[in-house]
Amino acid sequence: MVDKLKSYTKEDLIASGRSELFGENGPPLPSGNMLMMDRIIEMTENGGTHDKGYIEAELDITPDLWFFDCHFIDDPVMPGCLGLDAMWQLVGFFLGWLGGEGKGRALGVGEVKFTGQVLPTAKKVTYRINFKRVINRKLIMGLADGEVLVDGKIIYTATDLKVGLFKDTSAF
């Protein structure tokens, strides 16, 4: 049984990447540079706009983050796909938090809109995930809407983020 904490530290998230948080069969988060959050500040099983679950997480922005050096030279900006991936990471984390087992895989997104950017001068990115549905049968899948904010301003929105958990990904 998974301890359902309401918040998680960076150390907890790193432990998830080593399969130490939700057990050896739980979905791990990415590790290293691909872990796109520093903390989860709120998790609820019944909250959010659809009353099906909610997560809020944060990433501290500093000018020395790895992607600013290569995307782009003389025009540093966080790649939008990393914000989208962070939202998928959080959907998968939620499924593990609920006790789901397997390896997480992004399955799609309905629509993504970018209306701003993350520059090295920013201080904090906030991710908000509102769950619409969780299927927990033979297939374990989360469906959610998400927002990415930079310093309190919404800059990306995504509808129908889909993540599934798979016991065997060899034929995926």
From Swiss-Prot:
Positions annotated as active site in the UniProt record: H71
Pathway: Lipid metabolism; fatty acid biosynthesis
Location within or outside the cell: Cytoplasm
EC number, UniProt record: 4.2.1.59, 5.3.3.14
TM region(s), chain numbering: none
Keyword terms: Cytoplasm, Fatty acid biosynthesis, Fatty acid metabolism, Isomerase, Lipid biosynthesis, Lipid metabolism, Lyase
Any one GO BP annotation for this protein: unsaturated fatty acid biosynthetic process
Keyword DNA-binding: no
Record's keyword annotation contains Repressor: no
Signal peptide residues on this chain, from the entry's feature table: none
NCBIfam families: fabA (TIGR01749), PRK05174.1 (NF003509)
Biological role stated in the UniProt entry: Necessary for the introduction of cis unsaturation into fatty acids. Catalyzes the dehydration of (3R)-3-hydroxydecanoyl-ACP to E-(2)-decenoyl-ACP and then its isomerization to Z-(3)-decenoyl-ACP. Can catalyze the dehydratase reaction for beta-hydroxyacyl-ACPs with saturated chain lengths up to 16:0, being most active on intermediate chain length.
Family: Belongs to the thioester dehydratase family. FabA subfamily.
Name this polypeptide is given: 3-hydroxydecanoyl-[acyl-carrier-protein] dehydratase
